[in-house]
Each structure stands twice: as structure tokens, then as C-alpha cells.
């Protein structure tokens, strides 16, 4: 089912538990199509940049940028191309319960409170999405946005498409393909629900000194 990454492992467990004397037909498990939990990641040849909790394909013709908070922790990654950006963030979530429905409702409420066109829900390749607008860099105009959410085991991945990639299927396609190839490495550290899962810079890369 789109938007949920546990299907393959759960269904496989059910099949393995079927007694051998039962002869009823058994359906094949659904195949996870990505984004992937690290346990279900495919053995493919995609080159990925390793940001710790996120491993992102880098052959889509876009730049991968990182965003940091006030204490210089990497909290999000942005795929930037000529037709817009896609910001990726991974957050802690319950083990057996998705939070995208709740998060989506809260984002919609926030957008409605900004006196802009009412955001709308649409079905997309990753499940139910939220479409709306946010202020542009000048503060005088708006930018179309598209929020995508994927629930995984103890993690939630949010992708924010901004610019033409939010409304143009052709412009969005390479970004969607990259999103399908993302691997989430949640780790075992206990974190409050919705807390950003810390990312890290690739080996050998350092942030510039903010005082320089």
C-alpha cells in the first residue's frame, strides 16, 4: 500500500507461519517499491550519498544540499534542480502506527491559517498528498508546494516538493525516482515521536565555520 513501508516484511511473516498441511492458495507478498527501510533496501547499483539516516540516490541530475539548525546539526537534505526543490526530512515515529494522516491534517490547518488558497488532498504515487502554496523568497508572491509522506517502521519521511516540480509531472519525475530510491536508516536510539532523526555529513565533508 502506498505510503507504508512495512508491507513486505509483515506479509512474508504471515506466509512463513502458514502450517504446511494447509493447501489453500497463498498470495505473493507485495513488493516494497521505495522509499525503503534499511532492512528492505534492494541490492542495486544506485550510487547514494550517505547522510546517516538518509541514503539518497545522486544520479538524478540535481544537487544535494544539507540544512542545519542553530547548533549546526544537519536536520534535512534538499534536492535542488532547475525546476524546483525537494526537501527531505526523517522523523521518529511509533513502531506500529503511522503519523502521516495526522501530520498532513496539521499542515493543511497551518496553510489554511495563512489566508491562501485552500490546500487540497490528492492521490499520488506515494499515497495521499497535500497540495498548496507557501510564500516565495520575496514575501510578495507564492510558490506551489506538494507534501508527500511515507510511514515506515519507527520513522516518518516527509518530502516537500516546491516550485514547478510540485505541479508538473515531467519536472517531478526525476525527483520522484530519486525518492523511490531513498533508504532510511533509523537506528536504535530512542527519540520522541516527531523528533527529527539526526543526519550527518558524508565522510570528509565539513560545514563551514559560521563565524568565518
Range-by-range predicted roles:
Residues 3-4, 22, 26-51, 57-143, ...:
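Conserved polar/disulfide-associated segments of primarily extracytoplasmic proteins
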Residues 4, 8-16, 201-212:
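Compositionally biased, intrinsically disordered low-complexity segments enriched in polar/Pro/Gly
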Residues 37, 50-52, 151, 185, ...:
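Generic, ordered loop/turn and secondary-structure boundary motif
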Residues 62, 160-212:
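Surface-exposed amphipathic alpha-helical segments
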Residues 144-149:
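Hydrophobic/aromatic beta-strand elements that line small-molecule binding cavities or substrate pockets
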Residues 150-162:
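Short acidic, glycine/tyrosine-flanked loop/strand segments centered on an H-E-D-like triad
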Amino acid at each position: 500500500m502506498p505510503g507504508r513501508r512495512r508491507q513486505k516484511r509483515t506479509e512474508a511473516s504471515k506466509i512463513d507461519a502458514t502450517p504446511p498441511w494447509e493447501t489453500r492458495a497463498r498470495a505473493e507478498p507485495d513488493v516494497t517499491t521505495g522509499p525503503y527501510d534499511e532492512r528492505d533496501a534492494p541490492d542495486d547499483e544506485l550510487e547514494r550519498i550517505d547522510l546517516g539516516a538518509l541514503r539518497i540516490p545522486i544520479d538524478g541530475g540535481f544537487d544535494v544540499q544539507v540544512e542545519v539548525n542553530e547548533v549546526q546539526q544537519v536536520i534535512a537534505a534538499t534536492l535542488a534542480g532547475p525546476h524546483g526543490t525537494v526537501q527531505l526530512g526523517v522523523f521518529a515515529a511509533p513502531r506500529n502506527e503511522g503519523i502521516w494522516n495526522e501530520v498532513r491534517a496539521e499542515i493543511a490547518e497551518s496553510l489554511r491559517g495563512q489566508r491562501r488558497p485552500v490546500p487540497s488532498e490528492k492521490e499520488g504515487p506515494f499515497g495521499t498528498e497535500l497540495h498548496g502554496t507557501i510564500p516565495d523568497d520575496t514575501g510578495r508572491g507564492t510558490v506551489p508546494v506538494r507534501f508527500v509522506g511515507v510511514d515506515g517502521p519507527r520513522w516518518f519521511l516527509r518530502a516537500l516538493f516546491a516550485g514547478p516540480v510540485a505541479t508538473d509531472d515531467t519536472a517531478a519525475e526525476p525527483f520522484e525516482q530519486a525518492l523511490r530510491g531513498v533508504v532510511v536508516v533509523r537506528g536504535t536510539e530512542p527519540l520522541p515521536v516527531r523528533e527529527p532523526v539526526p543526519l550527518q555529513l558524508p565522510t570528509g565533508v565539513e560545514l563551514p565555520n559560521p563565524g568565518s
